[in-house]
């Protein structure tokens, strides 16, 4: 079913489903760093709307709490307190703004030179595979529940028709949650204690961030890895939606939107936000990539942030239920990376291509970490950086040079 054939009701249902996919990670980050989950939901929704405004409503991306800043926020809050640390997130926004201006200045030729398919393909694969450990960790808390959730989602996706085929995630979560409740492993105490309506604490008791240079400068190098991951995520979404969002509206706009969303998040007391691969995976399996559906997910996040019992109900979903669903979603992202390599006819008989792909994947899967003073880069950011450097320094064959000149 195409995006154009979706009725408003179906768009709403799929949009709510996308929030279910993003909910777990969005509220987990604030819990780990000592921030309020309801505020994180609010800033995720607000940040997504800001992103869509800047990108002219063209790019189907959902922004949620970023895991990349968990350790830096915990460390910085011990030195400068949480208000000062959140103000330091402005340094993250600055990095996005600078990169946006650089890409706008140099144009798409710079992107094509730094991120050809031989680099982007393995980076997309790693975005999926790097999340697989989190999926397994969640699923292994109760494999029976995880496989029930996964099996339900796969069955609906494979055999469903009409509306059912669009909601495999909701079906998987609903069945898994019901079985978990019958087994007595769902804790409803949070739902009972939660108020029906309550503003997020950061909004009810709003305080301006306390700006200081120290946390601002501390956060700047931390932002490099998320910025590199942002590029990979935009390429993933482009592949899933079959549209080149690096051309229209342009990567400079997606960078600017992400930066402004981070700025808004810290202003309202939430964690920094980033593009969410979980939602991209859900788009890939449902084939629904309409940006309006993502905006429905963002609006739902804001609504849930003020309806305490709904938010608490989602927080009561066992990790195993979400883990089972993530096993499907994250694997789907990795398959998009493989498809990207095939679609662009990357020749694996070329030694140069084999080297770039092999080293990029090994660095990412192996968990390599590069530390220089207070600066640390790892994961997707480091892998993408290694891929870019190898692509620039390894000599091309005459055939590759000719093909590149034709594309230019």
Place the predicted regions along the sequence by residue.
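Hydrophobic alpha-helical transmembrane segments of multi-pass membrane proteins
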Residues: 16-20, 115, 119, 140, ...
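Short, non-helical or kinked segments that cap or interrupt transmembrane helices
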Residues: 35-41, 57-69, 111-120, 165-170, ...
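Interfacial segments of multi-pass membrane proteins
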Residues: 72-80, 157, 279-294, 300-305
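Juxtamembrane interface elements at the cytosolic ends of transmembrane helices
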Residues: 24-27, 151-156, 167, 187-196, ...
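Membrane-embedded helical hairpins/re-entrant loop segments and their flanking transmembrane helices
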Residues: 2, 6-9, 34-52, 58, ...
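Hydrophobic, membrane-embedded alpha-helices of multi-pass small-molecule transporters
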Residues: 12-22, 145-149, 167-168, 200-233, ...
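Membrane-embedded alpha-helical modules
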Residues: 79-191, 298-404
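N-terminal signal-anchor module of multipass membrane proteins
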Residues: 1-61, 68-79
